[in-house]
Structure formats: C-alpha cells, structure tokens
Swiss-Prot record:
GO terms for biological process: alkanesulfonate catabolic process; nitrogen utilization; uracil catabolic process. InterPro entries: Luciferase-like_dom, Luciferase-like_sf, Pyrimidine_monooxygenase_RutA, SsuD_RutA_monooxygenase. CDD domains: Alkanesulfonate_monoxygenase (cd01094). Signal peptide: none annotated. It catalyses: uracil + FMNH2 + NADH + O2 = (Z)-3-ureidoacrylate + FMN + NAD(+) + H2O + H(+); thymine + FMNH2 + NADH + O2 = (Z)-2-methylureidoacrylate + FMN + NAD(+) + H2O + H(+). This is Pyrimidine monooxygenase RutA. FMN binds at residues 49-50, 115, 124, 140-141, 190. The keyword Amino-acid biosynthesis does not apply. It comes from Acinetobacter baylyi (strain ATCC 33305 / BD413 / ADP1). It comes from the Bacteria. Its EC number is 1.14.99.46. Keywords: Flavoprotein, FMN, Monooxygenase, NADP, Oxidoreductase. One of its GO terms (molecular function) is alkanesulfonate monooxygenase activity. SUPFAM superfamilies: Bacterial luciferase-like.
Length: 369
C-alpha cells in the first residue's frame, strides 16, 4: 500500500476552522514536510492548484503557492519520493504543461507525475476573464479528454497534430521528452468522472467518506472496475483521508471537536455556494461531497480520528480494499503529523512493515532519553 502526503500549498491546510493551526504556505514549510515524508518512506507527494480561496475569518485558501514551481523546487531537494503537480487545464495550454512536466521529470530524474483537473469554482477563472460560462460544466470531460490525448502524444512522440473541438495542434513539438512514463491522476466519483479515468488516467483520485469509516468509499472502486472492464485498462484508486491522532482516542476526538466548534462559517458558506453551481454532473461528484453540510470543516474528506493504534488499524483496513493502491494523507498539523505517522502510526501498520524495516523509528522512550 502506497502512502502519500497532500502538500499544504494553501494556508491552513484542509481545516476551515479558527481553532485549527493557522499558517501561511511557504516553500520552506513544504520542503520540511516532504523531506520528512521521504525519510519515513512515503511514496508520493501531491499538490493541488487553487487560484482563489473561500475568504471568511481564516481567509481560507486565500493564500496559495503555485503547484508546478513548488513541485519543481521539491523535486530538486528530494531523491526518492514521487512528485505530482496539478494542471489547471482551463488556463494552462496542454503543450506548455507537457513541456513543464518534461522539465520537472528532468529535475527529479523520472519521479514526476501529473494530476489534471477540469476546474469547478468559477471565481477562480472569471477573475482573469477565463471562465467559459456555466455551460462548461456539461462538457468539461470532453475538454479534458482532448487535453490528455495531446499530453500523451507529446510525451510519447514529441509531436502532435491533434484536431478536436477544443484544441487544434499544428505540428506541435515538445523535446526533450520525459525519461520515465508520465503517470496521470484524475479525480472521479461520478459515473462520468469514473468513465473518464477508466479511459485516460493511471490513478483515480477519490475522497474517503465519513468519520472513522475507512471502508465506506469502497463502492467507488467497484464502479470504477465496471468502467475499466470496458476499457481494458488497469486504473487503481488513490483515496484521500485526514488523520487526527493522539496518545488516546479521547485526546484525538477532543481535537476534532475543537476544530468543529471553531468552524469558519463564512468560508464554509462560500464553499457550499460554489459547490452547488454545477447542476450538470449529478449528486455523486467529489465537488458535491466537498460542499456537503455533513462535515464541511475539512471539506468532507474521510477523517480518521483516534489513538495511534486505532488510526494504524483503520489504515490497514483501507489497504485491504481491492482496487486501492494508495492513501493520500492530510493532517491537522502537518509537521507534527508526518512525524507522528512515521514514528507512532506506520510502525503499527501491517501493510507498511516493509517500509518500516528501511528506517529506524525512534520510540517514545528513546525520544525522552
């Protein structure tokens, strides 16, 4: 089972709460997190793209780094961990992204991959005059299909003459080409999104569901399998969870309750309003899950709260879900969270014993000695 870290490229990570750690994103912060993640055997690091935040008292995601330049920097200061940036495909031409990806492939010596997103929050793009109108919601996967086909052509052959509804290439060239196969991630939970991933992605990115219900998302894997049976492709799942861990279940749950008590209502209302504007994609999209009123304080991602032992056991449950190749983790406190994962959680995971054998966890007794 692969483990990844979802880099806090935006302020305050993934908690819309006045009671959560408040911090600004920086290269130094992300470098520290990813280097420590690499030390503990994390397999990959992924950063999102966000061009406008949600406001509120915490100014949630109003402050964001840029994903490609950040991950290029991280590629240069790491040696083993896989690095993924995210392409905002509405504002980044595919030929430019193909060349940027090839460059980071060179920096990382073949450790780079790409997450592609269609875009869902209109103000991110309308502020630049680049939102194509709400009719885009109905055709965004057709747009992304053309985009990915061009990427694959350029990476494989260095040249594209692709002609489609949205893009027209005329002897477009990219060289040098990537030295390693470029893996593509796409988030899909609706049937349309899953069908797209089955056709074009290497990994399908989904949200975990609920509080301490680690296997509740498993039905998405079954639906993805339905579509991959039709395409004949092997597409595995990367699933997102937040970890809030402590010495005891009670301590961890108290932190979770505090974050909920301090929820940034204004920022949450912005999220819910924007998430409801796509009326074309159905009720089962990842955006609809993000904007749900059930647990908006951490955008409704699956949440694992408990003692180190309990969290380790729940992560092992996820590892048993057929079709899941990796777990992407966020933490309430990223710096401490990565350390706690490496020292206190991962050594207890049956599914990660091969990784633990490669480094020496420092026991609590040794820490205090």
């Amino acid at each position: 089972m692969k483990i990844g870290v979802f880099c806090p490229i935006g302020n305050n990570g993934w908690l819309l709460s006045e009671n959560a750690p408040q911090y600004m994103p920086s290269f130094e912060l992300n470098k520290k997190i990813v280097q420590r993640a690499e030390h503990y055997g994390f397999d990959f690091a992924l950063s999102m793209i966000k061009l406008r935040g949600f406001g509120g008292k915490t100014e949630f995601w109003d402050h964001n780094l840029e994903t490609f330049t950040l991950m290029a920097g991280l590629a240069a200061v790491t040696s083993k961990i896989k690095i993924y940036a995210t392409a905002a495909t509405l504002v980044m031409p595919p030929a430019i992204v193909a060349r940027m990806a090839s460059t980071i492939d060179s920096i990382s010596n073949g450790r780079f991959g790409l997450n592609v997103v269609t875009g869902w929050q209109a103000p991110e793009y309308s502020q630049m005059g680049m939102w194509p109108g709400d009719e885009y919601f109905a055709k965004r996967y057709e747009y992304l299909s053309e985009y990915v086909q061009i990427l694959r052509e350029l990476w494989a052959t260095g040249q594209s003459d692709f002609k489609g509804e949205h893009f027209q290439m005329e002897d477009c060239r990219v060289s040098p080409q990537p030295q390693a196969e470029m893996k593509i991630i796409c988030a899909g939970q609706s049937d349309t999104g899953l069908e797209f991933s089955a056709q074009h992605a290497d990994y399908n990115f989904v949200f975990g569901k609920g509080l301490n219900t680690p296997t509740a998302y498993a039905g998405i894997n079954d639906r993805l399998k339905h579509f991959t049976d039709q395409t004949g492709r092997d597409v595995q799942t990367y699933v997102l969870f937040m970890v809030i861990a402590a010495e005891t279940d009670a301590e961890a749950m108290a932190k979770w309750q505090s974050y909920n008590d301090g929820a940034d209502v204004e920022a949450i209302n912005w999220l819910m309003n924007q998430g409801g504007k796509d009326t074309k994609s159905g009720a089962d999209t990842n955006i609809r899950q993000m904007a749900s009123s059930v647990s908006p304080v951490n955008i409704n991602m699956g949440t694992l709260v408990g003692s180190y032992e309990k969290v380790a056991a729940m992560l092992d449950e996820i590892a048993e879900i057929k079709g899941t190749e990796g777990i992407l983790l966020t933490f309430d406190d990223f710096v401490q969270g990565v350390e706690d994962f490496g020292e206190r959680i991962q050594p207890l995971m049956t599914s990660r014993q091969d990784i633990v054998a490669e480094y020496q966890p420092v026991t609590p007794l040794e820490k205090s000695a």
